[in-house]
Amino acid sequence: MSLSKKRKLESGDSGGAGAGGEGAEEENGGEQEAAPPRPRRTKSERDQLYYECYSDVSVHEEMIADQVRTEAYRLGILKNWAALRGKTVLDVGAGTGILSIFCAQAGARRVYAVEASAIWQQAREVVRLNGLEDRVHVLPGPVETVELPERVDAIVSEWMGYGLLHESMLSSVLHARTKWLKEGGLLLPASAELFVAPISDQMLEWRLGFWSQVKQHYGVDMSCMESFATRCLMGHSEIVVQDLSGEDVLARPQRFAQLELARAGLEQELEAGVGGRFRCSCYGSAPLHGFAVWFQVTFPGGDSEKPLVLSTSPFHPATHWKQALLYLNEPVPVEQDTDISGEITLLPSPDNPRRLRILLRYKVGDHEEKTKDFAMED
């Protein structure tokens, strides 16, 4: 699941990247009085604000209306009917209950739909409306504190945020796995992969060049605005969530991380940072604006079926996750076969572990190696 960018993940905590990156500089020429620091919220306060965001209908509408997402979960669950028939399932972050109902339709004997936000009340109504209250039990509260009457044969969860790890919900799934999943139990989805590729963002290029076109239309030369537009649109440290097309991608995408949800020690890996190195060669001449990060998750295929992949790639149909864009401070011209290499790490932000932080180190051709530190904003 992923909160709409129009909805705040948290109110009152400061955002932004760490001090080690190439962040945008002050350009107003004057000193500003520093605002008093905002009090840092406790973990329980942050969690409560996070849950409250999921109490509104809009975020659930966005998720269920994402046909790529919802159909992938429906098919991923139904393909595993043989493993679910007559078994018990835990749905972590059940929301309105649709995934729990899919599990019941696949033959599960009992589904525990755990939901920490107030939307659990609506989930209970949805379950009742579909005549499944004897098999789908909606349990209000965080999965970390809810007690089940038994261990389960399978866990299903739609835990993915922007850039895969924004919102840090995977930690809750791993907690549930350790506490409630039987040995050898089924995880839906079972794994996730992260990809990165250099991009030339056609829409951004149009916006940067817009100011040089004003004179042609209105007789006023505003080309001096282009450098200011570049600072505004690129010289920041925000992770930008936006849809790209395959035409925006400058080189072959590189997989830099793979997460097997059954892997022991994955919780510690997430805290330390998930990432890896990459290297690619450009397809042709273009301005390099930055890098795009996306993910895919895989559902086991059952006894005889191929695994099912839910992809958020710009080469696949769009999803509500879009792609996570990391803009450089300014465009860098590249040619065919220009070598681009680097390292990327995803980790929790220090001020709010639910907020994604991305550390990027990169080298373009013969240019010096640079770094930039990004964070997801509210």
Swiss-Prot record:
GO biological process: cellular senescence; DNA repair; methylation; negative regulation of DNA-templated transcription; negative regulation of transcription by RNA polymerase II; negative regulation of ubiquitin-dependent protein catabolic process; protein modification process; regulation of mitochondrion organization
Post-translational modification: Automethylation enhances its stability.
Uppermost EC category: transferase
Keyword field contains S-adenosyl-L-methionine: yes
Location of the active site: E158, E167
Keywords: Chromatin regulator, DNA damage, DNA repair, Methylation, Methyltransferase, Nucleus, Repressor, S-adenosyl-L-methionine, Transcription, Transcription regulation, Transferase
Gene field: Prmt6
InterPro entries named among the record's database cross-references: Arg_MeTrfase, Methyltransf_25, PRMT_dom, SAM-dependent_MTases_sf
Location, primary (coarse class): nucleus
Residue ranges with Gly residues bias: 13-22
Descriptive protein name: Protein arginine N-methyltransferase 6
Location of Asymmetric dimethylarginine modifications: R38
Catalytic reaction equation(s): L-arginyl-[protein] + 2 S-adenosyl-L-methionine = N(omega),N(omega)-dimethyl-L-arginyl-[protein] + 2 S-adenosyl-L-homocysteine + 2 H(+)
Listed GO CC annotations: nucleolus; nucleoplasm; nucleus
Domain (SAM-dependent MTase PRMT-type) ranges: 47-377
Subunit field text: Interacts with (and methylates) HIV-1 Tat, Rev and Nucleocapsid protein p7 (NC). Interacts with EPB41L3 and NCOA1.
Gene Ontology molecular function: any one: histone H3R2 methyltransferase activity
Region named Disordered: 1-46
Keyword Oxidoreductase belongs to the record: no
EC assignment: 2.1.1.319
Effects seen without this gene: Embryonic fibroblasts from mutant mice display growth defects, premature senescence and increased levels of TP53 and multiple TP53 targets. In liver, knockdown disrupts the formation of a cAMP-mediated transcription complex involving CRTC2, reduces the expression of genes encoding gluconeogenic factors and decreases glucose output in primary hepatocytes, it also restores euglycemia in insulin-resistant mice.
Described function: Arginine methyltransferase that can catalyze the formation of both omega-N monomethylarginine (MMA) and asymmetrical dimethylarginine (aDMA), with a strong preference for the formation of aDMA. Preferentially methylates arginyl residues present in a glycine and arginine-rich domain and displays preference for monomethylated substrates. Specifically mediates the asymmetric dimethylation of histone H3 'Arg-2' to form H3R2me2a. H3R2me2a represents a specific tag for epigenetic transcriptional repression and is mutually exclusive with methylation on histone H3 'Lys-4' (H3K4me2 and H3K4me3).
Binding-site list for S-adenosyl-L-methionine: H60, R69, G93, E115, E144
Family: Belongs to the class I-like SAM-binding methyltransferase superfamily. Protein arginine N-methyltransferase family. PRMT6 subfamily.
